[in-house]
Amino acid sequence: MKRIVATGTFDILHPGHIYYLEESRKLGDELHVIIARDENVRHKPKPVIPEQQRLRMVQSLKPVDYARLGSTTDIFEPIREIQPDIITLGFNQFFNEEKLKCDLEENGISAEVVRIEGYSGEGFCSSRNIMKQILIRRCKELQDDSTD
């Protein structure tokens, strides 16, 4: 059985997330998803949606066999427990792949690292762009309301 691990914050689910998980699932028999903990998200603004809700949403997605929250102290802990054959990275996850491979080896994890290409479909494919559009549209509505 080939186990795949996908990781991410998954704040404000969108078609790009679904594509990443579907493509990850195609690489093996079981897809395990590790959701970033609220307190560990440092590379971008804190998530809007709390970690337990993000976990519940990801658990309900068709390509996902298992989902769990990551560790607050050791990012490799759940990966050691799962023992995946492949770890997938999204196109916009800014990991140095060579460093990640070395870190995995140092932690006794012998998984292949595969980067999933970006989603090229229509619609919103970025949580940041979704939030930006919400702000633009709501600000315009508020401005229109204030001129009435």
Curated annotation (Swiss-Prot):
Reactions listed under catalytic activity: FMN + ATP + H(+) = FAD + diphosphate
Positions of ATP binding: T9, F10, H14, P15, G16, H17, N92, Y119
Coiled-coil ranges from the UniProt annotation: none
SUPFAM superfamilies per UniProt: Nucleotidylyl transferase (SSF52374)
One Pfam family this sequence matches: CTP_transf_like
Required cofactor names: a divalent metal cation
GO MF annotation list: ATP binding; FMN adenylyltransferase activity
GO biological process: FAD biosynthetic process; FMN metabolic process
Gene3D superfamilies cross-referenced by the UniProt entry: HUPs
EC number of the protein: 2.7.7.2
Keywords: ATP-binding, FAD, Flavoprotein, FMN, Nucleotide-binding, Nucleotidyltransferase, Transferase
Pathway(s) per entry: Cofactor biosynthesis; FAD biosynthesis; FAD from FMN: step 1/1
InterPro entries attached to this UniProt entry: Archaeal_FAD_synthase, Cyt_trans-like, FAD_synth_RibL, Rossmann-like_a/b/a_fold
Biological function: Catalyzes the transfer of the AMP portion of ATP to flavin mononucleotide (FMN) to produce flavin adenine dinucleotide (FAD) coenzyme.
Complexes and interactors: Homodimer.
Family designation: Belongs to the archaeal FAD synthase family.
Protein name: FAD synthase
Lineage of source species: Archaea, Methanobacteriati, Methanobacteriota, Stenosarchaea group, Methanomicrobia
Gene name as annotated: ribL
